[in-house]
């Protein structure tokens, strides 16, 4: 049996703690069942903080445009992790029906896509004009 786990968090120490707990429990279960176990770390990436100025800017644009928003941490390995190493980075999420994303069942209402695009456009204009 092969199992892979993607442990996500905005805190590196939380990811490490969960990884240790999973390994310990897997070894306990394997021992109890008389099985062998091999644990391999395929990849480990440290969380990258997003730019507070860009986050503040997008929040302020939402407020002034009457766009409902929610500040959400993301523990996923998005392109923003790589970009944040060389430039200020932030992410804009739009809601998907029933919270399903990265899946064939994902559906986002076109009006929400339009609002997300409007927010992105206004953010880019202000950043381009250095108004943040």
Question: Which residues fall in each region the model found?
Answer:
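A short small-residue
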Residues: 1-8, 37-40, 97-104
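Active-site-adjacent substrate-binding region
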Residues: 36, 40, 44-95
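Noncatalytic linker/hinge segments flanking ATPase motor cores
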Residues: 24-30, 41-52, 79-86, 110-118, ...
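His/Asp/Glu-rich mid-to-C-terminal helical/loop segments that flank catalytic regions of hydrolases
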Residues: 13-14, 19-25, 94-132
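Midchain, well-structured core segments that form catalytic/ion-binding scaffolds
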Residues: 1-17, 27, 42-43
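Generic non-transmembrane alpha-helical segments
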Residues: 21-33, 57-65, 82, 119-127
């Amino acid at each position: 049996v092969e199992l892979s786990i993607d442990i996500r968090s905005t805190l590196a120490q939380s990811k490490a703690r969960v990884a240790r707990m999973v390994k310990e429990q897997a070894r306990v279960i394997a021992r109890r069942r008389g099985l062998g176990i091999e644990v391999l770390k395929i990849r480990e990436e440290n969380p990258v903080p997003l730019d507070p100025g860009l986050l503040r800017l997008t929040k302020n644009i939402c407020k002034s445009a009457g766009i409902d928003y929610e500040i959400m941490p993301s523990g996923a390995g998005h392109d923003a992790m790589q970009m944040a190493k060389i430039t200020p980075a932030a992410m804009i999420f739009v809601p998907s029906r029933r919270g399903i994303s990265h899946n064939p069942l994902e559906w986002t209402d076109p009006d929400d896509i339009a609002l997300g695009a409007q927010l992105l456009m206004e953010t880019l204009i202000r950043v381009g004009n250095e108004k943040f």
